[in-house]
């Protein structure tokens, strides 16, 4: 079974004043298996952001399914959506969204603290990720003390 499966995804926006319909996504289908990496590329206005917003449960499709571990996330409640985002998604923004008054370790721990994880679990989760991303040596530094590439890796670890 695929980790993520997108079936016949369609998104149509209706303009506010003229009521014109703009089709942002048409019959999008793909699957992602565990361990695979996916890049979404396309021209400006091709629907990349719309697709990502639907995958992140920030927007609903007009029709179609988004299956994560076999569960259709397009039909879950607002409370379930918040839990889904916290437990299954990670966002890496272009500006990194790191807090300069927190060291890198605390920036990584922040979403775990908000999820009420205990310190031993946070430390256990951080160790292999920091090693894999090559950031063990910068965990006690602050974001303003590291390079852009290192900031990106800290954001990925978070």
Predicted regions and their residues:
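ABC family nucleotide-binding domain
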Residues: 2-158
């Amino acid at each position: 079974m695929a980790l993520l499966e997108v079936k016949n995804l369609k998104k149509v926006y209706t303009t506010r004043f003229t009521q014109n319909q703009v089709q942002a996504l048409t019959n999008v289908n793909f699957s992602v298996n565990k361990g695979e990496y996916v890049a979404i590329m396309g021209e400006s206005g091709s629907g990349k952001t719309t697709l990502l917003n639907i995958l992140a449960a920030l927007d609903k499709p007009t029709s179609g399914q988004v299956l994560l571990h076999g569960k259709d996330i397009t039909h879950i409640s607002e409370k379930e959506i918040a839990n889904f985002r916290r437990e299954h998604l990670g966002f890496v923004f272009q500006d990194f969204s790191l807090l300069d008054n927190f060291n890198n370790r605390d920036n990584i721990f922040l979403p775990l603290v908000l999820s009420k994880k205990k310190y031993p679990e946070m430390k256990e989760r951080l160790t292999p990720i920091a090693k894999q991303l090559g950031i063990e040596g910068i965990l006690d530094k602050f974001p303003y003390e590291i390079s852009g590439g290192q900031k990106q890796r800290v954001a990925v670890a978070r």
